[in-house]
Design a protein with these regions (language model features):
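C-terminal capping/lid segments that line or modulate ligand- or cofactor-binding pockets
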Residues: 40-70, 90, 394-414, 509-511, ...
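C-terminal accessory segments of proteins
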Residues: 448-479, 534
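Hydrophobic (often cysteine-bearing) scaffold residues that line and stabilize catalytic clefts
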Residues: 356-359, 399, 471, 493, ...
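Compositionally biased, intrinsically disordered low-complexity segments enriched in Pro/Arg/Gln/His
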Residues: 8-10
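Active-site neighborhood of glycoside hydrolase catalytic domains
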Residues: 469-501, 514-528, 536, 540-579, ...
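Alpha-helical packing segments of well-folded alpha/beta enzyme cores
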Residues: 316-323, 359-362, 366, 419, ...
Length: 800
């Protein structure tokens, strides 16, 4: 997959207008002084089902419509994993006997088939009619009335002549409501995606002018043979508009339906849509769905709500605001004026507390808005291009978990409920993977999913993702953390954990020369030893996943008849290995040499998020893990690699390394004006990893919790000496508010159950760079329902 989606233009500097007062910015929100010229810069709204990308152009108000279920059929839908279990024994023999390339034959010849690619639906367009008002839609520039939609020069958007920008133009996104507002003089456009009614709501007011409204399928990368069907019906209130896009060589289609209501004026059919003359305001309600056969348009139109904008917002707002507002960050910035800057200008101040505060709020907003029917994809729930990198899929071996990593501490159960929905909908496919590939009971997760299929089908010599057996434990772990916060695990989670343990019981039947269980074949995403092929033995991530899966299943289901067997098997797993460089080795097998320059940090799974290796209980292994982090390169500068590095560094109490990893992203031009992110520097490849993972880094550097431990400011970068964090959920059942200065920490705890916790703090200001010593611990007893306020001096011992 190419890295490039087109080079973004250099950002235009923001010059405040001296004749107008400085804009106020209600926090948390962001704004821009000009419309979005690129879809990547469009402001985003979403409810976890629908997504909207809002450009805010007064001359041609465009909203790209997305939906989590929109994936293009490509022949992969019904493919099953190949039957390779019969080849497993000979492969294990070969690897154990020293054949370092034997795994390349396991699945060789199986085709590499990408999952169904995620794609946009269409864009709603509300365009001021040309001066020659008799020109019908489809005949003017930018209108397309052809029978097929396709990529071509017309798919690239150019702002119409006369597009208004300047001191009176402003577009804003309010994170607390999910509403985008664009205004220019008396013209105003408001858009949000309703959580209550599952509909995209667009309301435009302004001078009565001729306006053209239609659903436009022409977007970059659209298939040339995408069949387009349209329907327009006038109503007393306005019009009903529909657009059906039938996928090539498929009975499936995505169908968009809109209801237009005009206040005053007249509405007439024109070309591919309608022309509105003299209306004071327009309300456009839009939905899209993917389905086989012919949709019942009358039923789809009738199902849209019959309410005005304010009533729709009144139903939506409590649902969104209560979720977003549970957790909030405030950072002290020496220059208060930075708080009011446009996002594009604030990004020019990468070291400022104001930027980190806004990106924390934006990331929290975006991950919430992308989570509902499913968790966030590689692009959240948004894209403006049919050619999405890596199919816009769920990449599970790193990216998905990084994106949802803030949900537990950040008190966003909606995100983890969506994550659980993805898993529960695929368990049958995971069982197929375990049986077909390994001849085992239980479940094995794939490395890629389109949201429909969970079958393993990625077979590639340099990316043998079918050998990755740690995926089920890795993906279930966020749900295990959520269960710790709640104090109980749901039955579905207990059952899934038991199935992971069943897989390991059947799979882990071989031993190494030391008598310990050998994990063979084994794969450390997406790296290889310097002196062996990708498929090998005893990847550290696999060891950690197997141990965690077996012990967790036994803890959650102590009465299970195999619980003792699971504990025994966990006890026979190999120990972690420390290599000649003093680093935690990526493979715990004699003779395998490290490859340090890589974007993934799979072998540090026992540090983050498992907390099996930490500075308090396992200081020797923590030091080795820190050495491994020091030696790790960033390879191709992927955003997820930098932020994964920061998460591990925070667990190891290294604030300077957290700061450096954040700087790699904030200095690297990874963020679009929308505050959605890119996969690579210079805003290359639209991707949500950085935007969604950054709040997790902030939370980890400020607060860490385990069932019996609380660590305050474990890895605070020096750039943020003062601040406040509200609404953090801890894994011992309390909600935490935190305020800190260079001299003092105040922690307010609201426990929901009794607990006795070990309390530690991070290093005081001015401490040398590197991993801080764990310091002394104190103990705090919490009683359910009894709030507790702790005030601690920031001193070197880390005590109370």
């Amino acid at each position: 997959m190419s890295r490039s989606t087109g080079n973004p233009s250099p950002r235009k500097p923001y010059t405040p207008n001296p004749s107008t007062p400085a804009p106020s910015l209600p926090n948390p929100s962001t704004w821009e002084p000009r419309p979005a010229a690129r879809w990547e810069d469009a402001f985003l709204s979403g409810n976890g089902h629908h997504g909207a990308m809002v450009h805010g152009d007064p001359a041609d108000d465009r909203v790209i419509v997305n939906h989590h279920t929109l994936v293009r059929p490509n022949g992969s839908e019904d493919l099953r994993p190949p039957e390779l279990a019969g080849e497993l024994g000979p492969l294990q023999d070969a690897l154990l006997s020293g054949n370092t390339r034997a795994a390349e034959r396991f699945g060789a010849g199986s085709p590499l088939v990408w999952v169904q690619p995620f794609h946009p639906a269409f864009q709603t367009r509300v365009r001021r009619a040309p001066a020659e008002s008799g020109t019908p839609l489809g005949a003017g520039a930018g209108a397309h009335g052809t029978a097929h939609a396709g990529a071509g020069p017309e798919a690239e958007y150019t702002a119409p002549a006369g597009t208004a920008t300047g001191p009176s133009y402003r577009r804003e996104l309010d994170f607390t409501s999910g509403e985008t507002v664009a205004s220019h003089g008396p013209w105003r456009s408001r858009v949000f995606v309703s959580r209550a009614d599952d509909v995209i709501v667009q309301h435009i007011t302004g001078p009565a002018a001729d306006t053209e409204v239609w659903l436009d399928p022409v977007l970059p990368g659209a298939p040339a043979n995408l069949a387009v069907g349209r329907s327009t019906v006038l109503t007393p209130q306005g019009a009903r508009i529909a657009l059906r896009l039938r996928y090539p060589e498929s009975d499936l289609s995505c169908t968009g339906v809109s209801v237009l209501r005009a206040e005053g004026g007249t509405v007439s059919v024109s070309g591919d849509g309608v022309r509105v003359a003299g209306a004071r305001s327009l309300l456009l309600l839009t939905r899209v769905r993917r389905s086989p056969g012919e949709p019942d348009l009358d039923a789809e139109w009738a199902a849209l709500p019959d309410d005005d904008y304010d009533a729709l917002m009144a139903r939506h707002l409590p649902l969104h605001r209560s979720a977003f507002g549970r957790c909030a960050l405030t950072l002290h910035d020496e220059d208060p004026a930075r708080q009011g800057l446009p996002g594009s200008e604030l990004l020019r101040h990468p070291g400022s507390p104001a930027l980190l505060e806004r990106l924390f709020a934006a990331g929290r907003y975006h991950v919430l808005s992308a989570s509902g029917a499913l968790p966030p994809r590689l692009t959240g729930v948004w894209t403006g291009d049919w050619d999405t990198a890596w199919s816009g899929a769920f990449t599970t071996n790193a990216n998905l978990n990084l994106q949802v990593a803030s949900a537990t501490a950040g008190n966003l159960p909606e995100v983890l409920d969506a994550h659980a929905r993805l898993i529960e909908g695929q368990l049958d496919h995971w069982r197929e993977n375990a049986r077909a590939l390994f001849g085992a009971r239980g479940i094995v997760a794939p490395s890629h999913s389109d949201g429909e299929s969970g079958r393993t089908r990625h077979f590639q010599r340099a990316y043998p993702l079918h050998l990755w057996t740690a995926g089920a434990d890795w993906l279930l772990h966020p749900l295990c953390e959520q269960a710790q916060c709640r104090g109980a695990a749901p039955e579905a989670l207990v059952s899934a954990c038991a199935e992971v343990a069943d897989f390991y019981t059947d799979f882990l039947t071989r031993e190494g020369p030391d008598g310990a269980v050998a994990i063979v074949p084994s794969y450390s995403p997406e790296n290889r030893p310097e002196n062996a092929s990708w498929g090998t033995l005893n990847a550290t991530m696999d060891i950690a996943a197997a141990r965690h899966a077996l012990t967790t299943a036994a803890e959650l289901a102590p009465a299970h008849p195999d619980a003792d067997r699971w504990r025994d098997l966990a006890g026979r797993l190999p120990r972690y290995r420390i290599n000649a460089d003093g680093a935690l080795a990526e493979w715990a097998w004699p003779g395998l040499r490290e490859t340090y320059d890589h974007r993934h940090l799979s072998h540090l799974y026992p540090v983050w998020p498992l907390d099996e290796i930490n500075p308090y209980d396992t200081p020797g292994l923590a030091a080795a893990a820190h050495r491994a982090l020091e030696l790790r390169g960033s390879e191709n500068d992927s955003a997820h690699g930098h932020l994964h590095h920061a998460l591990v560094a925070a667990r190891l109490r290294d604030g300077a390394r957290v700061s450096a990893a954040l700087a790699s992203v904030l200095d690297g031009d990874f963020f679009h004006d929308s505050l959605m992110s890119a996969h690579y520097p210079d805003r290359n490849v639209y991707n949500a990893d950085a935007a969604h993972a950054l709040p997790a880094v902030v939370l980890e550097m400020l607060v860490q919790s385990a069932p019996g431990r609380l660590v305050l400011l474990p890895a605070l970068p020096a750039a943020y000496p003062r601040g406040a964090l509200r609404g953090v959920r801890t894994r011992f059942g309390a909600v935490l508010d935190l305020v800190w200065t260079p001299e003092e920490i105040t922690a307010s705890l609201r426990p929901t159950r009794d607990a006795r916790i070990e309390l530690r703090t991070g290093p005081p200001p001015g401490s040398p760079a590197g991993p801080a010593e764990p310091g002394e611990a104190s103990w705090v007893t919490l009683t359910a329902g009894a709030d507790r306020v702790l005030t601690l001096r920031r001193r070197a011992t880390g005590g109370r």
